[in-house]
């Protein structure tokens, strides 16, 4: 009887043990996190339902997604995403499971762009290209040093402007009676320019708060000293500066105002904005990690031509020289500019700007001096941006920084 009892007891114990080990895991509603990051990267916070968990990062993402041990604690998991310098978007899915088990506690989808800014987040607020006339002559000086561009953070979040490219001169001239060759319109793919300058920084140096603006000037001098009609540009955020090859045409540098990084300008002397706006302006965000040397090597504008309708009645096919191309996908904002009655061709594609802003009713109109083009403000307090500068801008209006 004792032996039988022992056998039964052992059998019952074994059955009970098997029953316990076969119990299903306690279920849980997994946390779902979806995060879209800019190229700069950053942290992703996951509030896991339990403290004991395993983090499963796919092998192909392990080089750019890691656990941020310093900031993770208890149920709070922090994933660190590195800067994206691949030149393309990337994504991954990280699963968080119960420790030693297969039960999913959280699913984290991470998508990362290869750029730091999106189109429309920064817009061109104002372009002052005409120059300020001297009281004595009624004309500005030839250097046009008090020219400026205002660039607004038109989004709802604070953004970094590091690396932003300014195209200060389009390859096409809106004041030339010309047209593109059918089937060879490069504007559908890119913006052609011949002057490129970038905002310096390492990614998180130039913070622009939501609704605030950067002022970029030709020369950051107090221009009222020589011209009482002008303005004091010494408080500008940046200036563009050129090392001239001609000692008779030298630029002026203000050491207290940071210079833009010059990538290229076709002029061998001093870069200015066209004083009638015939060469348009745009801002862009190149891929993270792209250098000036790479840009010049990889993005020349080749075999571009247009037809010029000469005043003598003849048409000429002309090459577009000394230009580089910026893919339209990089463009944050582009503004076609010129004279009201002497505007013939749009430097930028209609998808970027279907209209144009202007100063001066005709070519050479002296009434344009002291005037600029200023983007309108909507009822929500943001700048209007419909990609049509005819509607979006107040043209031929007094420059905002001229008192």
What is each PLM-predicted segment?
Residues 1-40, 45, 101-119:
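Bacterial Sec-dependent N-terminal signal peptides
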Residues 48-78:
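Surface-exposed binding patches on compact interaction domains or structured appendages
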Residues 82-88, 222:
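Short, surface-exposed loop/turn segments at beta-strand-coil junctions that are enriched for proline
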Residues 164-197:
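The feature marks short-to-medium sequence segments in extracytoplasmic or secretory-pathway proteins
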Residues 186-402:
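Solvent-exposed beta-edge/loop recognition patches
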């Amino acid at each position: 009887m004792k032996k039988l009892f022992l056998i039964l007891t052992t059998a019952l114990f074994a059955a009970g043990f098997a029953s316990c080990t076969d119990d299903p895991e306690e279920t849980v509603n997994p946390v779902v996190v979806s995060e879209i990051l800019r190229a700069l990267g950053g942290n992703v916070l996951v509030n896991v339902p339990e403290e004991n968990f395993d983090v499963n990062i796919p092998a192909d993402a392990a080089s750019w997604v890691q656990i941020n041990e310093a900031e993770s604690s208890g149920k709070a998991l922090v994933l660190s995403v590195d800067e994206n310098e691949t030149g393309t978007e990337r994504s991954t899915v990280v699963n968080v499971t119960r420790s030693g088990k297969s039960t999913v506690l959280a699913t984290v989808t991470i998508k990362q762009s290869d750029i730091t800014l999106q189109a429309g987040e920064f817009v061109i607020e104002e372009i002052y290209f005409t120059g300020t006339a001297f009281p004595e002559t009624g004309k500005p000086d030839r250097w046009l040093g008090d020219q400026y561009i205002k660039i607004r953070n038109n989004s709802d979040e604070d953004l970094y402007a590091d690396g932003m490219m300014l195209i200060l001169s389009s390859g096409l001239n809106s004041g030339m009676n010309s047209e593109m060759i059918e089937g060879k319109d490069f504007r559908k793919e890119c913006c052609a320019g011949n002057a490129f300058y970038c905002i310096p920084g390492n990614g998180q140096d130039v913070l622009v708060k939501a609704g605030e603006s950067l002022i970029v000037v030709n020369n950051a001098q107090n221009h009222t000293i020589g011209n009482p009609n002008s303005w004091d540009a010494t408080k500008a955020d940046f200036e563009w500066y050129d090392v001239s090859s001609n000692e008779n045409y030298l630029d002026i540098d203000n050491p207290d105002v940071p210079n833009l990084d010059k990538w290229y300008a076709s002029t061998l002397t001093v870069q200015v904005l066209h004083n009638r706006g015939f060469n348009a302006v745009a801002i862009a965000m190149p891929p993270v990690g792209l250098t000036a040397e790479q840009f010049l090597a990889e993005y020349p504008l080749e075999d571009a031509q247009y037809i010029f309708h000469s005043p003598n009645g003849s048409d000429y096919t002309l090459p577009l020289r000394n230009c580089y191309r910026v893919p339209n996908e990089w463009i944050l904002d582009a503004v076609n500019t010129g004279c009201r009655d002497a505007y013939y061709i749009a430097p930028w594609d209609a998808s970027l700007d279907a209209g144009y802003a202007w100063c001066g009713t005709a070519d050479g109109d002296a009434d344009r001096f002291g005037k600029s083009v200023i983007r309108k403000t909507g009822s929500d307090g943001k700048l209007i941006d419909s990609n049509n500068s005819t509607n979006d801008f107040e043209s031929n209006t007094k420059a905002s920084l001229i008192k």
